[in-house]
Amino acid sequence: NAQPPVERKEIQVDPSLSRGSPSDRYKNLVEEYKTMHSSANRMFNGRSLVKFTDIIHSFVSKNKCKTLLDYGCGKGHLYTDQYSTVSDQIDKPVNEIWGLESFRLFDPGYPEHSELPEGKYDAVVSTDVLEHVPETDLIWVLDEILNYVDKMVFLNIACFKALKILSD
């Protein structure tokens, strides 16, 4: 059962785009996420992070990280007392598991976490986010992530059909 070769295509980036001037498609997706967030408490609650808890813990420990930014955190329930509503696979919030002194949550689609972070963090994690960023905006989003980090970045980019249907 040989798989057919993967069709590769060059991505179309637009170097003129930035946080201050993103593509219209990016702006529309953020608005779509805001609507989806408000429709259900369980929507984008951070559950995709659960399966990476151990590996992130290993990287955070190895790199002696004490501060962390979750870029595209959704509601970020795994960092709060609501962690148990998301998963029974962990017994405390992930920031406690990872031994962090501080953490910051950022998600432009969720008003509670939509304020742009400032400063640097030892670690930046982003799970199941980048596959939704329009290709034209990828460079500035990746630059933004890299400008927040001092020690390590953990990116998980889903390469399978999404469970949620978005306009992207």
Task: Enumerate the predicted regions with their spans.
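A short, conserved alpha-helix within the catalytic core of class I
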Residues: V133-E144, Y148
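Conserved N-terminal segment of class I S-adenosyl-L-methionine
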Residues: N1-K120, I139-L142, C159, L163, ...
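Conserved acidic functional residues
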Residues: D107, D128-E131
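Short glycine-rich, flexible loops that bind phosphorylated cofactors or substrates
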Residues: H132-V133, A162
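A conserved beta-strand element that flanks and buttresses the S-adenosyl-L-methionine
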Residues: V125
